[in-house]
A protein has these predicted regions:
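N-terminal leader/propeptide segments of preproteins
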Residues: 1-21
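General structural signal for secondary-structure boundaries
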Residues: 5-8, 82, 183
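Structured binding/interaction patches within domain cores
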Residues: 16-172, 178-181
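Low-complexity intrinsically disordered segments
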Residues: 165-202
């Protein structure tokens, strides 16, 4: 099933976890402390009762964190959390999860720096991969896909799909725990990329 279809069919828990996972994996671009959002994962488990309060606390925690000089990418990461709905309802959560999916893929594609045909063409490739069930196979090994997205973006696509599948198949806290583990794997990948770039620029 395509990523777009999985988002369309996900329930509130799956949508909240999917959006949060996208944001969580991008945190290394913003802060050295990459467990800031762990309490919000508990909010996903708690659902309607816990989500609003934990979301508010997570925003305050992220605002208090110092990080690299602001740029377009770090602003996007902050905006992802700022746009999260406090209402535990499928409609707003689906809109947020879909936006987070696109933004996270765009960030990973920028770090891949694959192709020289401009941002519009890159966005078109990502949109095609989100709607293409065959993109799952291409992304499975984290290698550059046949649609021209780089290995980082392909790995991010794979994780987004896998997390939504896990949450659809595994109920309760167990599914959220597995989604968090998979997201943490992606976070480590991006943190390594950020570290390499920092060393290269020093």
């Amino acid at each position: 099933m395509s990523l777009v279809k999985l988002i369309e069919e996900a329930d509130e828990r799956g949508l909240a976890a999917s959006g949060l996972a996208c944001l969580d994996r991008c945190l290394p671009l913003l802060a050295e402390e990459t467990e800031i959002l762990r309490p919000l994962w508990a909010g996903v488990v708690g659902g309607e009762e816990d989500w609003p309060a934990r979301l508010s606390a997570s925003r305050e925690a992220l605002d208090a964190v110092g990080g690299p000089a602001p740029d377009v990418t770090t602003a996007l990461v902050r905006t992802m959390l700022g746009a999260a709905p406090s209402e535990w309802a499928a409609g707003p959560l689906r809109t947020w999860a879909d936006t987070c999916s696109v933004v996270a893929l765009e960030i990973h594609q920028q770090l891949d720096a694959v192709g020289e045909d401009g941002p519009a063409a890159a966005a078109e490739r990502l949109a095609r991969c989100r709607e293409d069930t065959g993109a799952v196979t291409d992304a499975a090994d984290g290698a550059e896909s046949t649609d021209g997205i780089g290995p980082l973006a392909a790995g991010e696509l794979r994780r987004q799909i896998a997390i939504l599948e896990i949450l659809a198949e595994t109920a309760g806290a167990a599914g959220v725990r597995r989604a968090l583990d998979l997201s943490t794997e992606g976070q480590r990948v991006l943190r390594a990329v950020v570290s390499r770039r920092a060393r290269a620029g020093s």
